[in-house]
């Protein structure tokens, strides 16, 4: 069978008009799904669709936990806080003060802990497949590429904000995530390196100033754990509430 000849008009069409996975290398791609505003105009201007993509894997590689990643995500989490927000295997228990600063009510939070990597990945997949959560933040040291692909596929079936938070070294590993950012602490804010995005290469890191939680909550109560963790294998009952 002879392949159909490409029409002359196709040569001048926007790449996205030919296939949604295509874009010009000199331009940011159009968003293939709904995006959530980052709340940081300088960052949004550098992302396809002008925000965090939903229904897909987003890789955040951290120099170390606690460098400002939660403050970076605060506006987006507040935007989806009408639905459950899942913290899976966070390095520290979530604190009431931090949740208040994020605009998240403790009743909307599910804090999950798992004993093994397999349980972490299983729980993440169940959250994504349920379609009932506004955001999933999953902390993990090492994840095999095939496991990332499985989670990415599960994410595409819904509109959950899905962030995988891993060490900087993970930036050298392959990942199906269309957006990968490396985060490093800087005085007064955070430095963001665009490891991968659907658009032109950006070599210079982006600096974002971040305001401390305590700046907004000077009279907040003393930090305390927001709730007890849920075992990963006991997740199903939490998702149907």
What are these regions (language model features)?
Residues 1-87, 101, 106, 197-200, ...:
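Detector for small/aliphatic-rich hydrophobic stretches
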Residues 43, 60, 109, 136, ...:
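Conserved RecA-like P-loop NTPase ATPase core
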Residues 72-76, 98, 123, 147-151, ...:
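A short acidic, amphipathic alpha-helical/loop segment
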Residues 83-86, 96-97, 102, 118, ...:
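Glycine-biased, small-residue-rich flexible motifs in mid-sequence functional cores and linkers
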Residues 84-143:
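Long, charge-dense
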Residues 128-172, 177:
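A contiguous pocket-lining binding segment that forms or flanks enzyme active sites
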Residues 166-233:
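Phosphate-binding/switch region of NTP-binding enzymes
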